[in-house]
Amino acid sequence: MQESSTKHVVKEDNITNNGENENNGITEPLLFFNYHEFLTENYNVHPSCRHNSKARSIVVNHFPNNHVPIDSSMYSDTRIVRIPRIFNTIQLSDIIPQFSNYTPGTEPAAINDQQGFTFKPVGIYDNNSFGETSVTPLVPGYMTEEEFHTIIDNINKYLHEAFSPYNVWNLFDSILDLLSANFYNKIVNNFLVDTYSKRKLLELEMYIENDINLGMFASRPGLKILSPRKSGYLSVCIDYYNSHQNHCTNYLA
C-alpha cells in the first residue's frame, strides 16, 4: 500500500521559530491544511468513472468510526471527518484548544481542482468513496456552510472561556486552589461546587447534545457531533449513517 501525506512539504531547516517558511531570504507564512487527510494511489476506480482515465491519487479525508465497537453495525454504517485544531488564531493556543473553521476543502493549502467546491467521487478505498480534492461530502451534503461555521465558532468560544488562564473566574479558582494548598480543587470542586472551567465544559457538552444534535440536526436522523472531549480536544467529530455502499457519509471529529 502506497500512501503519502498532503501536498505541502517544507524542509525543517527552512522553518523559523515563529512557524514561518524562510526561503532565499523571503519569509512567508506557512499555509494551513487539514493534516488528518492523506493521499493514496492504491484504490479502485469508482463505478461512475469507469470510462475516465484513472487519477494518479485520491484524497482520503473521512475515516472509520473508531468511537464504536468495530464489530457493530454503526462502525460500518458511519464515517468520520476530522476537523483539526488550529494554532494561529489566538494567543496561548497550546493550552486553549481551538478548531479550524475552514469549511473542509477550503483551507489555504487544500487540494483543489477546477470544479470548485463540489465533492466528486473518483475512487474507492477501504470500501468507501473518495475524490481527487480535499472537499468532503460533509458540506454542503449534510449541513450548510453557515451551520458549520456557527457550530465550530461556538465550540471555540466555549473552549476559550473554559481554558483561558486570564479569565477572571479561572484566576479566582486558581488563587483559591493555591491558598488552600490544593484543598479547593481536590475537595470543594469534587464534592461541593464545580470550577468555572468545568462548568463551561459542561455547558459545551449540553450545547452539542441539546442545541445541535437534538435541535439543529433533529430533522436529520443519524447526523450528530461527538464531544471533542472524546478525542482529547484534538479534533471535532460528526456522524452520519452510510445509507449506500461506497457512498461517503460523515462524522465531524
Curated annotation (Swiss-Prot):
GO terms for cellular component: endoplasmic reticulum membrane; endoplasmic reticulum palmitoyltransferase complex. The keyword Disulfide bond does not apply. It is found in: Endoplasmic reticulum membrane. Residues 1-14 have a biased composition (Basic and acidic residues). The keyword Plastid does not apply. Disulfide bonds: none annotated. PANTHER family: GOLGI AUTOANTIGEN, GOLGIN SUBFAMILY A, 7, GOLGIN SUBFAMILY A MEMBER 7_ERF4 DOMAIN-CONTAINING PROTEIN. The ERF2-ERF4 complex is a palmitoyltransferase specific for Ras proteins. Palmitoylates RAS2, which is required for its proper plasma membrane localization. This is Ras modification protein ERF4.
